[in-house]
Amino acid sequence: LGDAERLEVADASVDVVTVAFGVRNFGDLGAGLREIARVLKPGGKVVILEFSTPRNPLFRRVYGLYSHRLLPAIGGMISKDRKAYEYLPASVDEFPAPECFMAMMREAGFKDCRARSQSLGIAQIYTGEK
């Protein structure tokens, strides 16, 4: 385990960085992205899988009811930790929209940034190259 904003890895020493459902938990999203760029070799790739808010208004509403009401209730009953299941949708709501996140990636030093919607928009796969 370590701090994603202070990786114990040499500059330009990594070919690929992958993150699954973690960047929305970075204390400083920009710093975390810059740190990923720092450790990547020139031409290195970053692949990030992260939750997203669906764009379709009807599905967004249905998914919002599920994630904000049903998931915390059921998850809290099973785990006895409702707060963890309330945090999840709140953190997704606060995460930047795909266009904004890709702008942050470019600002951190990535090029050819792309987002591919998954599962009707509840997740995105972001890619970029150093």
Where are the regions that the model predicts?
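A short acidic, Gly/Pro-enriched loop at the edge of an enzyme's catalytic core
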Residues: 1-17
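Alpha-helical transmembrane segments of multi-pass membrane transport proteins
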Residues: 3-5, 29, 48
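A short SAM/SAH-binding and catalytic strip from SAM-dependent methyltransferases
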Residues: 15-29, 52
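Short conserved AdoMet
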Residues: 27, 41, 130
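A short glycine-rich, Lys/Arg-flanked "PGG" loop and its adjoining helix->strand segment in the class I
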Residues: 30-45
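A short hydrophobic/small-residue beta-strand
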Residues: 46-47, 112
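C-terminal alpha-helical "lid/dimerization" subdomain adjacent to the S-adenosyl-L-methionine
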Residues: 52-108, 114
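C-terminal lobe and adjacent flexible extensions of AdoMet/dcAdoMet transferase-like proteins
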Residues: 104-130
